[in-house]
Amino acid sequence: MRRLAILLSLAGIADSSYLLLSEAVPCPTGVCASISVFSLPPFVPALLGLCWFVLSIVVFTAGVNRALLTFWRFSGVFGESFLGTYAVLHGYFCPYCFTAYGIGIVVVAISEKLYG
């Protein structure tokens, strides 16, 4: 399970990195980086996602204390829920974003199974 979580986290890093680069590179679906949450620059959600996935590698390789694990889980579930709901309500269906949301949910579920 730990290996699966690390592999999924690496996929999340790749996905979030692509979303960061989509500011400079044309998106094949035409919807990438076309929405801004609360007038923040469009790269902010992708940057936060990238940081979260990098931290998830630390969670599964080095281990962390209970407080950091709880914060990591909460920030992941909150971020995915908020951005997913925001995207649906605004008719914004970026496959790369929803892939990151799905990966994040699975990674949190694996952490719950491993660490309780």
From Swiss-Prot:
Which residues are listed as membrane-spanning? 5-27, 42-64, 88-110
- Give the UniProt keywords, A-Z: Cell membrane, Membrane, Transmembrane, Transmembrane helix
Task: Tell me where it resides.
Answer: Cell membrane
A GO CC term? plasma membrane
Topology in the lipid bilayer is annotated as: Multi-pass membrane protein
Q: Where is this chain primarily localised?
A: membrane
Q: What is the name of the protein in this document?
A: Uncharacterized protein AF_0712
State the species of origin: Archaeoglobus fulgidus (strain ATCC 49558 / DSM 4304 / JCM 9628 / NBRC 100126 / VC-16)
